[in-house]
Amino acid sequence: MIPESTIHKAVELLKKAANPVKIILFGSYARGDITEASDLDFLVIEKELKARRMEMVRLSDVLRPLRIPVDVLVASEKVFNDWADTPGTVLYEAAREGKVLYEKA
């Protein structure tokens, strides 16, 4: 199990690296059904996003020093708002089951 303090550090690193609108923890850690195989699943929502895949790789690299199993997905604010109500999408899952760990004021 990944300690809460490490999750907090991950959020702080993502905030500094991405200047996000919102960071959502979703998946098993958000649902509370954590197993030994569980990783952290973060959705980082940015105001605008030009190169989604490159940004996912970049943010994953930012978290590498924490040495934890993690998946970082990114979406623009518009894409998130357009797809968050569409069942069967990761954005729907994150919107419904996720925990908002950071939201820009």
Task: Locate predicted features.
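Conserved H-loop
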Residues: 28
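Catalytic core of pol beta-like nucleotidyltransferases
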Residues: 1-22, 31-36, 47-105
